[in-house]
Amino acid sequence: MATNGLMASSSVFLHRPRIAFASRTNQTVGKYGKGRVSFMGIGTRRLPVVLSMTAMADSGEEAVKSVLPGNGISIMVNGCSGKMGKAVIKAADSAGVNIVPISFGSAGEDGQRVEVCGKEITVHGPTEREKVLSSVFEKHPELIVVDYTIPSAVNDNAELYSKVGVPFVMGTTGGDRNKLYETVEEAKIYAVISPQMGKQVVAFLAAMEIMAEQFPGAFSGYSLDVMESHQASKLDASGTAKAVISCFQELGVSYDMDQIQLIRDPKQQVEMVGVPEEHISGHAFHLYHLTSPDETVSFEFQHNVCGRSIYAEGTVDAVLFLAKKIRLKADQRIYNMIDVLREGNMR
C-alpha cells in the first residue's frame, strides 16, 4: 500500500470518496512526558479503547442545558471576540454561570465592546491588565478565568493569573508548556490546563495511550496514513493527530510527523472529506488508517468534530470541576481534562 499520503493514486481511500471521514456507525500533572507527544501526561491508569467518534455542534445544545447551576461561579473569558471565546460564553450562560463583562485581548482590540448572549463585554488591551484583573478578582472572589487567546500569549497570561492568584482554565494551545506548569506550580493556584477540551476526544486519546502502553509493538511493520482537515485558518498540523501518532509509534509503527496530510482547501474538504459546507469554517476531522505488511489486514481510527460546542461544553465542565476543587480546598492544584472525566462530569 502506498504510504505517501491518503490522496495518492494508489491509496485505497480514492475508492471511497466523500466517506473517508464518515462514521461507519452514523496524571501526571506537570511537565509533559519525554520521548513522545503525550497529550495529557495521563500516567499509567488505563481505560477501554474507543475506535471511532463523530460529534456535531448542534447535538450538544440540549446537553449544555443539563449542567448544574453555576452556584455563584463567575468567569472572565479572555479572547471573547474569538469564535471559541463566544462559544464558551454561550455555554456558560446556559449553565447559569455569571459572565463578568470584562475580557483581555490584543492592543488593537482595546476598548472594543463585544456582545454575546445579550451581554456587552468590554475588551482591555495589554496595558494595566494586572490592575484590571485584581479589581475584578476583588469584586468576584469566586472568579475563574477562561483563556482562549493565542499561543504566543499563553505564558504571559499564566504569569498574570498566577501573580494575581486567580484560578483559571487554559484552553489555549501552544506556548512553553513546561514553563506554564512551572509557573502555576510555583504560585500554588488552582488550574485546569488542557490543549483539548472536548471530553469525548480526550477519552479517545486516553484510550490510545492505554493501548500504546499495554501493547507496545502490537502494530510493528504496519504502514500508517494520516489525514486531518481543519478550517483554512489553522496552518499547523493538529496536535491531537500528533498525540495519536505518538501512540502508534509506541505500537511499533514507523511514521514521521511531517507525513501528516493536511486538508485545508474547502473544495477538497467538501468533496473528498465530506465536511458539511456549513462547518467549513469550524471543524476538526481526523483519520488514521493502518495496513499490515501484506495488505491483508487494515484498521481505521477516526474522530470528527463539526463546530465548537463540544469544546465549549467541556470548558464549562472544567470550570464547574475547578470551582468544586477550590471549595473543597483540594490538595492537588493543577488538573487536566482526564481529571474532569474521572470525576464523572460527563454530560
Swiss-Prot record:
Major enzyme class: oxidoreductase
EC numbers for this chain: 1.17.1.8
Function: Catalyzes the conversion of 4-hydroxy-tetrahydrodipicolinate (HTPA) to tetrahydrodipicolinate.
Active-site residues per Swiss-Prot or TrEMBL entry: 230, 234
Family per similarity comment: Belongs to the DapB family.
Cited CDD domains: DHDPR_N
Entry GO terms, CC: chloroplast; chloroplast stroma; cytosol
NCBIfam families: dapB_plant
UniProt: NAD(+) binding residues: 79-84, 171-173, 194-197
Organism: Arabidopsis thaliana
Keywords: Acetylation, Amino-acid biosynthesis, Chloroplast, Diaminopimelate biosynthesis, Lysine biosynthesis, NAD, NADP, Oxidoreductase, Plastid, Transit peptide
Residues annotated as binding (S)-2,3,4,5-tetrahydrodipicolinate: 239-240
Top-level taxon of the source organism: Eukaryota
The UniProt record lists the keyword Magnesium: no
Pathway per the UniProt entry: Amino-acid biosynthesis; L-lysine biosynthesis via DAP pathway; (S)-tetrahydrodipicolinate from L-aspartate: step 4/4
Location(s), subcellular: Plastid, Chloroplast
Pfam families (UniProt xref): DapB_C, DapB_N
InterPro entries registered for this protein in UniProt: DapB_C, DapB_N, DHDPR_bac, Dihydrodipicolinate_Rdtase_pln, NAD(P)-bd_dom_sf
GO biological process terms, semicolon-separated: diaminopimelate biosynthetic process; lysine biosynthetic process via diaminopimelate
Residues the record lists as N-acetylserine modifications: 52
Organelle targeting peptide span: 1-51
Name of the protein: 4-hydroxy-tetrahydrodipicolinate reductase 1, chloroplastic
An MF annotation (GO) of this entry: 4-hydroxy-tetrahydrodipicolinate reductase
Reaction equation(s) it catalyzes: (S)-2,3,4,5-tetrahydrodipicolinate + NAD(+) + H2O = (2S,4S)-4-hydroxy-2,3,4,5-tetrahydrodipicolinate + NADH + H(+); (S)-2,3,4,5-tetrahydrodipicolinate + NADP(+) + H2O = (2S,4S)-4-hydroxy-2,3,4,5-tetrahydrodipicolinate + NADPH + H(+)
Main localization, broad class: plastid
